[in-house]
Every structure is written in structure tokens, then in C-alpha cells.
Amino acid sequence: MYKKILLTVYLCISLLQVGAVGINKNNNIKNDDGFTTIVFDRANSPVPYRIPAITETRKGTLLAACDFRLSHTDVGWNNRNGLWQINIVMKTSKDFGKTWSDTVCVARGNEHAADPVRTAFGDPSIIADRTSDNVLLHCVAGKSAYQTATRQNPQHAYFFHR
């Protein structure tokens, strides 16, 4: 029960962070000045970006993360070629979203990992602590799909801390 309450609070905080800047249906971020910037450009990438997350650090830096789905499918599913890999990529902005850094992979899935949990990382959410410079990135991981997960073969929650 405690885990469900904690997860609900965590998701609500994540959604509030996204709503503070505003993401439209095309994955664009629009700020209060009215300009729109494409953060992760799906039009020029053969690999789909999905599930965006955004937060602002104590110093005003925007952190935007999303899935980079090399498998072209969700965590726990493989494509026709047997590829499972999904990475989480991130960009930063120090000018409230007018310009963005190059894309950096912050969680790299590994098709050949000895531990199947490290095969894919996806569905990111980010929390930035307002009193420190700590950032927490949460995601799901592994080869188990949400729909088929069991206690013996779960879909894992992963946390990265900076």
C-alpha cells in the first residue's frame, strides 16, 4: 500500500513539472514568451523518441529526457529482428528552453547484457531537488513487458541519481 501511495505522489509531481512548461502534441516545448522549440526531433530520426519528461533544477537548468527506442517498441517487447534495446537520452537548456544541448545517452540498454534488467531502459521521469543540486531519474527496465510481468519475472524500476 505504501509503495502505491509513494508512486502516486511521485507521478503527480512529475506531471506538475511537465505542466509548468507545457508540452504540446508534437513534443514541442512552449514557454511563457510564446516561442516553440523542438527538443527531440522525430522527423529527422529513424529511431522514435517517446515518453518525454522535463524538470527544472534549483539553478534554473531545464532537463528533458525521453526514450530512444532502437527496438521501435516498448520495454519488455522485441521487434521483428529480435532487438530489445531502448536507451534514455537527455538534453539540457540553460536559457529556459530557447536553446538545447546535444543529446546525451544517460541510460544505455545492452542487448547482450548478462543481467537482462540492463537490456532496456524506458518511460523516464525526473525529479530535481529544490534545496540541493540532486536529480533523480526513474525509469522501468528489463525484458519483461508490463502486461506479462509476474512476481518471478517482474518489470523493474530503476533509479539513477546525480
Which residues make up each language-model segment?
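Asp-box/BNR beta-propeller blade signature and adjacent active/binding-site loops
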Residues: 23-162
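Hydrophobic h-region of N-terminal signal peptides that target proteins for export
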Residues: 10-19
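Bacterial N-terminal signal peptides that target proteins for export
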Residues: 1-9
